[in-house]
Amino acid sequence: MQLKDRHTVEGGRERITLVPESLDDLWHLAYVLEPGDFVAGDTHRRIQRNDDQMRDTGGEREHMFVTIDVGDVEFHKFSNRLRVSGTIEDCSREDQLGLHHTLNVAEREELEVEKHWQPDQLNRLNEAVEATDQPDVAIATVEEGEAHIHVVQQYGVDEQGSFTATTGKGEQNDRGRDELFGTLADALARMQADAIILAGPGFTKQDALDHITEEYPDLQETITMVDTSAVGGRGVHEVLKRGAVEDVQEETRIAEESELIDELTTQMATDGKAAYGIDEVQKAVEFGAVEDLLILDERLRLERAGEGDWVDVDVNDLVRTVEQQGGSVTVFSHEFAPGEQLRNLGGIGAVLRYRLD
């Protein structure tokens, strides 16, 4: 993410000009933007003139710069788009003011965002800026007969490929093994990841490593091996829990979330220093007992938009109070397993400085 300009405007709002540079950046924006914000950018809009209406031609598409009063935001990771919908607040044609329009924001397209920024939202932008310099990490998990490739993103982990083959003893099965390792090697080479974690149970991953580095010697210095008891999604979770990603990526959102949710559930299991659900967490905040506040991005956005079910709770005040008391706040991605765990706990939890009872 590039932040190109930033200044205060009327009403205490702040306008930031930025350029999303990756799918991760678009995902960050999806959880920063909310109804009532103003988003401005270049777009094309179909304009229907009187003669067009008579002929029912649908009008001509015109390029214009528009400002949208945001009503809805949708992140479409499979089409690499962020859709920002709302009414036109400002543009070069007065006859279009107040009409509905959707900005399709893509990577490397400059836009302006004007809003009342919350501290965690600014932190999220700064995180996206810093992440630009972090390496791309692929996690390959392999055992006899199957291999999987996942890519670590800031919004979660995406599975990029899954391969199977008949392996075992015998010449035919040896051929299947070579084909599996060859397919895995080809896929990893095409990805051009900055770092690769090769994981799995037993000695199969060592055989896979030998095959990969024989075919693609340049990959050897990018590969780190990690022992896990499983492959696929479970194997990836083990890799993250063990901090292997942090060894090659100085800071990763997912590893931090995995560590925090594990700490929370451990404290819950031992009847220790933990709170979950809005009622318990709100009580802990009132006592100044929150060391780490965990909150789900979806829940935070719903509550800020007034569409949630936390009665008489100002979520911005809650977050601000924790920070003023010296606690940390982590906004979890709903796209990954730790976020799913947090959702099952009501979308909010806290690791405490001390027990409340």
Curated annotation (Swiss-Prot):
One of its GO terms (biological process) is ribosome disassembly. It is found in: Cytoplasm. Its EC number is 3.1.-.-. One of its GO terms (molecular function) is endonuclease activity. One of its GO terms (cellular component) is cytoplasm. Pfam families: eRF1_1, eRF1_2, eRF1_3. Transmembrane segments: none annotated. Its cofactor is a divalent metal cation. Its main location: cytoplasm. Keywords: Cytoplasm, Endonuclease, Hydrolase, Metal-binding, Nuclease. SMART domains: eRF1_1. InterPro entries: eFR1_2_sf, eRF1_1_Pelota, eRF1_2, eRF1_3, Pelota/DOM34_N, Pelota_arc, Ribosomal_eL30-like_sf, Transl-rel_pelota. Monomer. PANTHER family: PELOTA (PTHR10853), PROTEIN PELOTA HOMOLOG (PTHR10853:SF0). May function in recognizing stalled ribosomes, interact with stem-loop structures in stalled mRNA molecules, and effect endonucleolytic cleavage of the mRNA. May play a role in the release non-functional ribosomes and degradation of damaged mRNAs. Has endoribonuclease activity. This is Protein pelota homolog. It comes from Halobacterium salinarum (strain ATCC 700922 / JCM 11081 / NRC-1). The lineage of its organism: Archaea, Methanobacteriati, Methanobacteriota, Stenosarchaea group, Halobacteria. The gene is pelA.
